Amino acid sequence: MNPSQADAYLRRIGAARPQHPTVEALRELHLRHLRTVPFENLSIHLGEEIVLEEERLLDKVVGRRRGGFCYELNGAFGALLTALGYEVELLAGRVYGDEGRLGIPYDHLALRVRTADGADWLADVGFGAHSHFPLSLAERGEQTDPGGTFRVTEAGPDPAGVTGTAGPGSAAGGADLDVLRNGGPQYRLETRPRALADFTGGAWWHSTSPRSHFTRSLVCSRLTEDGGRLTLSGRVLTTTAPDGRKETREPATDEEVLALYREEFGIEPAVVPTVRQRGQVG
């Protein structure tokens, strides 16, 4: 990413260029990204190709002012942070599902970010409702955040009996890490750094498999200025207050749905997105 691209990205999220890669600047960038770049899976249902290459991600997030899912959002954010002087590594995660079962390999992409003081942080702007600020990767106690109470712990065996190790060459002694929110496991991270291209298979699976929740539903969601959340799921708009109270409404017309995409998320689809049926082309 060149300086002009970085400046355009910073304008996209309404942030000033930090003078140094500090944790304070990282917190501000993380929060502004969550407020301005929506977590959304519209490309899957609009028949748009998802390509995990830096230039393509920048074109989508910055040039076309869209959002994306974890691979796109954290991939693009990681490129920005690198351009701003942070040391960034891509980490592969597996999301916890029903009965504590872990998802597929490369199920999730998150970032390990090293700040100027040498501290390592977990930055994740691509997991929907999650921490508003980066989490310390060195801290094993509770970390209080507007998004909940989080813990980062060394992983034990999963329900299948697989131990939480990432293999030779991994950081943190080779141990996988579990990320918990309000006492419940969210995802498991390998600590071995990966390349963006490594996540191509995971992105393809989530974009095509009938078992992926991304192919079965529509979502467009962002953090609000007051710390709540605004989510458009198909035609249902849910407003979540900072205290967790929810209000829902369903627009009556296509024009109202398109206006919500435009006014609340900055997205201008030509038609109202609908869940793409299996085998449907174009």
Q: What is the predicted role of each segment?
A:
Residues 66-92, 111, 220:
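Cysteine-centered nucleophilic/redox motifs
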Residues 1-65:
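Secondary-structure boundary elements
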Residues 1-13, 17, 38, 95-242, ...:
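His-Asp-centered catalytic microenvironments across diverse enzyme cores
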